[in-house]
Amino acid sequence: VLNRSGFFQRHIVSGELTYKTHSRVLVHHQFSPLIIQYEYMKHMTPAFTELVNKSPYLLVAMSDQFVPKMRYSFSYQSPARLHNPIFWQVTLSEAANLLSLGYMAFGEKWTDKEKTMFKNPYAQFLKVETDYSKTWQLTEHSKLVGHVNMGVVWAYGNAISAPYSEQFYVGGANSIRA
């Protein structure tokens, strides 16, 4: 449940099938061939409704929709014995490409909008993220940590924008999403 006091309450119901493997102690692979999410608005205040009506982007990003996706993650963590260890992770997600291929098999065009899954629109996007951190041991009881997180999401096909839950953000409860 995403609860933005004074604006909205959004629910996300999901389930997934995930396989995890460790090719080596320090290298991990995670593959999720089936992730199904349904995102819907439970409540919107009049103030938020006014904002949504003024912004086509918000209207699309906050609409009720299915998000059928697949995801693969690779992560590496250097040995704990190293004085200045690192952690690196790369994640690739895609949504609804197989579903859209099924629609194409029955005559729909890839670029057609308003295709549905269980009578609700579905999201279609490609997302790549990477996360890197390095720790420097300064003294016995103090460390300095550098952290970089980057990503890009591209909505296409059946979607104009990525779902709210897939957008990048900074901060906490009052975050900025882009």
Tell what function each PLM region has:
Residues K143-A178:
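Extracytoplasmic gating/loop element in the C-terminal half of outer-membrane beta-barrel translocons
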Residues V1-G151:
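Transmembrane beta-strand segments of outer-membrane beta-barrel domains in Gram-negative
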